[in-house]
């Protein structure tokens, strides 16, 4: 997991073999939200976005199968 500069998102991680994006939000720091089927291009756009929270809400949240786990 990599810390990011965002008021919404605490950290993100990505497994290119399974195309799974993992996101930890500041509001739920003990929960990892896992998004399946996220392409490398989408992750690159996400990590390079000026507003990661806005990108997350418009391009990721609610658009991919999601599971969550407690850390």
Labelled PLM ranges:
Residues 1-71:
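Acidic/histidine-enriched, beta-strand-rich ligand/metal-binding domains
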């Amino acid at each position: 997991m990599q810390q990011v500069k965002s008021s919404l998102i605490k950290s993100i991680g990505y497994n290119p073999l399974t195309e799974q994006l993992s996101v930890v939000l500041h509001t739920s720091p003990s929960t990892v939200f896992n998004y399946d089927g996220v392409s490398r291009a989408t992750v690159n756009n996400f990590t390079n976005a000026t507003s990661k929270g806005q990108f997350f809400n418009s391009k990721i949240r609610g658009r991919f199968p999601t599971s969550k786990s407690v850390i």
